[in-house]
Amino acid sequence: MKRIFSGVKSPKLSAPPKVFKNDESPSTPSSPKFDQGLRSLSASASRLFSNSISTPGSPTLDLPQEHSINGDISPELVPIVTLLSAQAHRRYHYGIFLILHDLKTDGTPAARQWEECYGVLLGTQLALWDAKELSDSKNNKNTSTMKKAASRPSFINFTDASVRSLDANDQVIIASENEKTKKDLDNVLVVSTTLKNRYFLKFKNSKSFKTWNAAIRLSLFEFTALQEAYTGSFLSSRGVKLGDIKVVMADTKFTYEDWVSVRFGTGMPWKRCYAVISPQSGKKKKNSKGSICFYENNKKTKKSNIMTTVVDARALYAVYPSSPILIDTSTIIKLEGFVSFDKSEEPQETNLFIMPEKHQGVPGYDTIIRFLIPAMNAFYLYGRPKGLIANRTDPDSLLFALPTLPHIYYLQVDDVLSLTKDKNYIHWSAADWRNNIVQVLQKKLSKGYKGCGNKTVSVSSGMMKSPAISSAELFEGYDSLPERQMESPQKSKMKSPTLASTDDINSASASVNSHATSVKQTELFVTDNSSKINDSVSAQSSVTTNFKDTFTTPMTSGMLNHENSERSFGSGLKLKITDSNLENMEDVEAKSANEFSTTPEDKHIHLANAAELSALYDKYSTSPFGKSEANSSPKPQKLEVKDRSKNENRSPYERYVGTSAESKTFEIGNVRESKSTINTSLSSPLRVEDSRRSKNEDLGSLKEFEELSQKISNMGMANISSEALSDTAENSSFVTDLNLNINNSSSVNLNEEQRVPDFGEENVFDPDYMEQNQMLETESRYTTDEFDFSDNQDAASSNYSNGQTNRTVTETLSASDRNDKIPHSSLFTNLNQLTSNGGNYQDREDFSGDQINKPQQSQPLHVKGPQTSSFGYRNSSANSSQPQAPYPVGRPLGKIRTGPLTVQPMQQGGNSSMYSFQSSQHRFHSSQQRQNQSLSFRNNTYGSGNNQNTFHPSPQLQQQPQNMRYLNNKLPINDRSPIPQTQHHVPDGRPSLHINTTNRTNPLTAQSGFSQFMPPNSTSTNPYSS
């Protein structure tokens, strides 16, 4: 049978929503009020990056929620996603500086005019506003103009940018209309987000320059470190799902080949290549590494087809797709290393994006893991191929210096600022900055450092649910700011009236929501003039957004050929800037040096207000972790100033840490101290798990994943329930080894220590399950109405029986018996198949037809008596596929079990519902025994396929005969042994042909052989039919 890989299907993402109307507004889509209605907040954030123009008449669509795909994210990913969200919304620094857009994205000259900007570094994105426009709006006291100016920032993405400081070797030629002068630019950073564009950022003094430089370097370091940590948690949570993970993790000398798409530079198109990962060759030097060769086609034997070769790698990690719903589908890998385009040239330091192509029926995480592991082995990264390093104090580990929650940051800006005391820091490359930051962390880790960041900081729900930057984050200050701003109070650099202070901007932007914080709940409505503005609306300010062409940069994530930029700067940068206005701007700065002052920290708006305002900027109304239910239609966003602890839509960080009103200790729920994620509680039935993964001790190669899982789990404080779950898994050998589940709706009730989480549906993608399913299909031919071979036909014979016979037997079963522990047979891996249909005639006395039709009302049975022999009760728990009808009392049975078998009758009112018999008295004729066994094997081969609610014998009955046969190590193929009959011992060994029917409490003989398949018919002449 063809193997089907496990995993969820790729989600079909719908288009971003355009417009939705308020619940309180009964307007129709054609009404003007609907066209001007409140727009989707997430769509507004996306248009801030895409600069798209909205269409009022577009249909309403919703973004898919994560829990609609695969439920809660893996416990290993919860701390990492929390840290990634916190880093994306961390404000590293803000202030005023000059910017010059030198080259556009296509390499053509830009305006090349110095503009004064107010900038905020939030995560790895620098938001920019025109300082003159903000100042004019403040001084003119024009609220509408102020809102319009505040809601249209431009962004520079530093994620994959090349950042370099100008030094004494760099000369800038400033060409004016009259003359050309050479002038050295001090305190200038050169930023290139693509291979062709370029920006110059000039700061007013050395102090400001060092602070901005340190803040940018720290943001880039934290982003890369968290991507590596995400890769480690991704491997630990998804690696165990691969069926052949043991082979993937093995240290082999074989090459790995696959089709990939490669982007050799930001702004460059994706190129489809055939990648070949070659490990170290035995003929090479001892310290040599492997390589990754990219070919134009799969004819790799031709050397002329080689496009490029990666000869070394400094970092290799999976890129977090910015949203948890895309984790299982994203296959983008970033490689930082040295690439050779020609053998005659020296390798160049650069970054590559690699995206392995997905295969049909294979989930994305399967594809990316199969590429990551061989690539790490080739370049000896993160401890591979020996084993992934899980020690957070090791610089080579994927989890190096990972903050332990509730700490959410690696370092403060002041910690990196201390590195600028080195005189050579201005010449450092990106790798030098990273190495020096690692040294700072190593010193702190040696003293037990666990990270920084306010332990009581409350991250707003908007920050955690959406990668978009909220207006409140851009303007308002909160605890993530550095304790001391390096930007000294300065005046505006322009001739216009003084620039509004940050506190004034806060008050102006906060005034957009009319009395938003003065009431408990406030709903937003779009102003009347919103339809007159062309671009997307900002939900926080309720106005639209326009980007200025001089500031607009492409927001697509990319990377820069770092070697090219280093080569252009290495011998001294020579720039020619025509019509520069730098001198005029410097004159303005000198004249207004004492008029501008930044906002004191004690004037910042309270954090709760900032969190509430930022919540208006986000579309998502449910948690990205799937804890709350998704809504089919978006709801109007609301502000709740009080009782925020009762809000169901709190951010994931708030749900773990708790708000200030709760004073809750930070905990990570459901993060066990176990070595895998197999027995974690899953809330969605779509979550597919492989039961074979429960025995991770048999997979030696998973030790690396287990260590990563433990380290990541230690990032948060495990709760009591997780520890109890781990202890239960260790103490119960049946539950741990076989991954058993108990259906709560069944009649079998277990104690709390025997309960294990319900995994929902069976793993239909498991090859073993499919083989079992094929076996069940074969059995269905014997249970359909067409063949009429089901054991349920025996129910017709129940018309002859007395309905009250032995009814008192079941009434004697006490409640305490139902709560007794019932050990489970080691032959089953899922009790959900065994706990829904009631017992059979082998497990109890005769019942009436009503009792048989209500198997859920049957009582649990317990075995009492000596150990069975090798023949009697042969795995009766595995062969009770369907409830059996009682046989008529007082009528001769068609098939009498031959062979002397002395059995003790059942005691009335006892706790045992089965007959105890002495195995030493079992004596059989060899010919009759072989005949009975052969008939049973033929007729009941698949009798246990759909078995449910089957009685499980006690440990003393679990010993199986040596001649038991198994199919694929799953279910035994054996006969359904009839219940032992009460017969008088005959000295000559011949069986008795008559049954005493006067005592109705005596056990009845069950049919066996072909007679049980004969339909009951009163006119039948078949001597074997009853």
From Swiss-Prot:
Highest taxon of the lineage: Eukaryota
Modified residues (Phosphothreonine): 578
A Pfam family the protein falls into: PH
Keywords for the protein's UniProt record, in alphabetical order: Cell membrane, Cytoplasm, Membrane, Phosphoprotein, Repeat
Coiled-coil features, chain-numbered ranges: none
Xref: InterPro entries: PH-like_dom_sf, PH_domain
Biased composition (Polar residues): 623-635, 826-840, 850-884, 904-915, 935-960
Feature: compositional bias, Low complexity: 916-934, 1015-1026
CC per GO annotation: cellular bud; cellular bud neck; cellular bud tip; cytoplasm; plasma membrane
Entry's localization field: Cytoplasm; Bud neck; Cell membrane
One of the GO biological process terms: signal transduction
Modification Phosphoserine occurs at: 10, 31, 580, 592, 701, 954
Molecular functions (GO terms): protein kinase activity
Keyword Cytoplasm: yes
Membrane topology: Peripheral membrane protein
Biased composition (Basic and acidic residues): 637-653
Main location (coarse class): cytoplasm
Region (Disordered): 1-36, 483-504, 623-658, 813-960, 1007-1026
Domain PH: 90-221, 254-433
Quaternary context: Interacts with phosphatidylinositol 3-phosphate.
Biological role: May play a role in cell wall integrity.
Record's protein name: Protein SKG3
Gene: SKG3
